[in-house]
Amino acid sequence: MEIVCEDFQKALTKIKLLRENANIIEETVQRSVREIVQNVRESRDEALSFYTKKFDGVEIKDVRVSEEEIKQASMFVESSFLEALQEAKKNIISYHEKQKRQSMFDCTSKGIIRGQIIRPLENIGVYVPGGTASYPSSVLMNVLPAKLAGVKKIVMVTPPRAGGIDPHILVAASLAGVDEIYMIGGAQAIAALAYGTESIPKVDKIVGPGNLYVALAKREVYGIVNIDMIAGPSEIVVIADETGNAKYIAADLLSQAEHDERATAICITTNIELAKEVEKEIERQLETLPRSEIARESINRNGAIFIVPSIDEALQLSNEIAPEHLELHIKEPMNALAYVKHAGSIFLGPYAPEPLGDYLAGPNHVLPTSGTARFFSPLSVDDFVKKSSFLSYTEGALRDVKHHIVELANKEGLHAHARAIQIRFGEEE
């Protein structure tokens, strides 16, 4: 892991290069995804079967997981896992319940009623990865806010494995309240949810993480359906002063690096001695990590430690990065919170490590990446509702403002708009 002692602009340039390196999207992948989406749109289940055999190496007659399979899954998971899952569910619900909003009704004294109706989406699709790692936590994080919002039907898709679907995923889906589960993955699963097939229902919105093919497929179908976000590789920035614990920081950096080779792990510190200790700790901890090959590749390609003169400058640099995860290993981290402008999720102090947010604390772990924390937010209950405005005017209320409407409509050259007002008062030209 490279230690960089440079000025702000040079450090920022280097970080941008790291991010560009982590987000290289080959044109061949985009073309392949576009072809998959088009084929599923046209050939539907036939295309799903073809791509499942091609990419997953299995032939599946019925892609829907039966109720019996879901019930049996609980026999294959540990009681400790179920206990942890239930604790996570409790915390996720208690946090997201506070995000729920009410419809608005505004009645004035002049015969005017205005308002906003908030309604849940009818149905959504949740993508759950099934590649190099299995993510039951993602099931809870994507499904529970939707349930709290009142979504009527939740469909889950996840890639098949040789022995079926990981029972931990099925147990999480059952606990969260998923209505239907399908053994289908990749870009073809996203296309199926967007357009519908003989087996898989069309949904209104698709959420959930995935690999590059899944991310590009979501981009491809956006507009046909809504999506949560186009997630890039995982990323973490740790800001540390001389009080930072090198073991903790190294462990937290590696917690993101182990996701995949394109993940980004950056430490920004005011203390060069700490930087050296973190570098050594990363090497030491890599020796015993089961996913060390992935983590090492990530650290070598997209990892760095930046030395800056002050915490103020560290915060400026972090705001320019707008990371998915930001940890503050500094004195009085709560005081620095006001100066964090752009970050998906912020972890304050040495005992609020990123995995706490990933699994148990309650805030959502579906977060904006690749600098999009400047304008995107974590997944929330709001992502599963839509809003309609409504208004009612009495004749007198409309009469009071009609001249303003006519003036504005005529100024824009939209004379039928003006006439629609005038005709109600016998003033049409």
UniProtKB/Swiss-Prot annotation:
Q: What is its EC number?
A: 1.1.1.23
Which sites bind Zn(2+)? 256, 259, 358, 417
Binding residues for NAD(+), per the UniProt record? 127, 188, 211
Annotated substrate binding sites: 234, 256, 259, 325, 358, 412, 417
Its UniProt entry gives the catalysed reaction(s) as: L-histidinol + 2 NAD(+) + H2O = L-histidine + 2 NADH + 3 H(+)
* Name of the top EC class for this enzyme: oxidoreductase
Q: In which pathway does it act?
A: Amino-acid biosynthesis; L-histidine biosynthesis; L-histidine from 5-phospho-alpha-D-ribose 1-diphosphate: step 9/9
Any one biological process term the GO annotation gives: L-histidine biosynthetic process
For the keyword Amino-acid biosynthesis, the answer is: yes
What S-S linkages are listed for this chain? none
Q: Which InterPro entries match?
A: Ald_DH/histidinol_DH, Histidinol_DH_CS, Histidinol_DH_monofunct, Hstdl_DH
Listed GO molecular functions? histidinol dehydrogenase activity; NAD binding; zinc ion binding
Its cofactor is: Zn(2+)
Q: Which GO terms describe its cellular component?
A: cytosol
Pfam families, per the entry: Histidinol_dh
Cofactor binding: number and manner: Binds 1 zinc ion per subunit.
**Source organism's superkingdom?**
Bacteria
Q: Which UniProt keywords apply?
A: Amino-acid biosynthesis, Histidine biosynthesis, Metal-binding, NAD, Oxidoreductase, Zinc
NCBIfam families, A to Z: hisD (TIGR00069)
Function, in words: Catalyzes the sequential NAD-dependent oxidations of L-histidinol to L-histidinaldehyde and then to L-histidine.
Q: Which family does it belong to?
A: Belongs to the histidinol dehydrogenase family.
Protein name (database record): Histidinol dehydrogenase
